[in-house]
């Protein structure tokens, strides 16, 4: 999640989890509309989630992303490599990793139509993550809906959805 938006979500979640400890990891990849660059993010995020689950088995993870970051997390939580994905696409995470993920918060996740327009396969959240996932799409956001309002796509830090996602994630953390 970029800049202020990311910090706003972290602050909102931190304010809701009380004395629980919280670490943050920024996925490493070049965020562009060139889909193959997202592969680096899918590899990095999947590897980090798997390693954290293995090395810190009592930890509960909250995954999140905005726009292309939401697409990255969508692919990370997929149950299968989607049709049309590059041959070197990362494999899905082992099913037992899902036990370590408490919540997935996706803002402005690209729609099937948007993914098609950039030559990328559709995003399908895997069944082990579906009930743990909140997908938030601002009205008129052209990335996640059929709208044409780019201000909506760039306004998630100001429209109350960050708070909504933080409440959801905190509730899933228990």
UniProtKB/Swiss-Prot annotation:
Molecular function via GO: carboxylesterase activity; lipase activity
EC code: 3.1.1.-
Biological process, per Gene Ontology: lipid catabolic process
Active-site residues, as the UniProt record annotates them: 67, 141, 153
SUPFAM superfamilies, per the entry: alpha/beta-Hydrolases (SSF53474)
Site residues by UniProt (Transition state stabilizer): 68
Key words of the record: Disulfide bond, Hydrolase, Serine esterase
Cysteine disulfide partners in this protein: 137-144
Entry-linked Gene3D superfamilies: alpha/beta hydrolase
Job description of the protein: Does not exhibit cutinase activity.
Family: Belongs to the cutinase family.
UniProt name for this protein: Probable carboxylesterase Culp5
């Amino acid at each position: 999640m970029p800049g202020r938006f990311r910090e706003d979500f972290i602050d909102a979640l931190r304010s809701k989890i009380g004395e629980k400890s919280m670490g943050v990891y920024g996925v490493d990849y070049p965020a562009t509309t060139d889909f193959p660059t997202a592969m680096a993010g899918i590899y990095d995020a999947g590897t980090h989630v798997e390693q954290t689950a293995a090395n810190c088995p009592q930890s509960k993870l909250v995954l999140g992303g905005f726009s292309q970051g939401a697409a990255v997390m969508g692919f990370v939580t997929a149950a299968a490599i989607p049709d049309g994905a590059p041959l070197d696409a990362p494999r899905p995470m082992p099913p037992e990793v899902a036990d370590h993920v408490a919540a997935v918060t996706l803002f402005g996740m690209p729609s099937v139509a948007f993914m098609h327009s950039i030559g990328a396969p559709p995003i399908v959240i895997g069944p082990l993550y579906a009930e743990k996932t909140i997908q938030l799409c601002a009205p008129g956001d052209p990335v996640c809906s059929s709208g044409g309002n780019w201000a909506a796509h760039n306004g998630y830090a100001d429209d109350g959805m960050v708070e909504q996602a933080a409440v959801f994630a905190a509730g899933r953390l228990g």
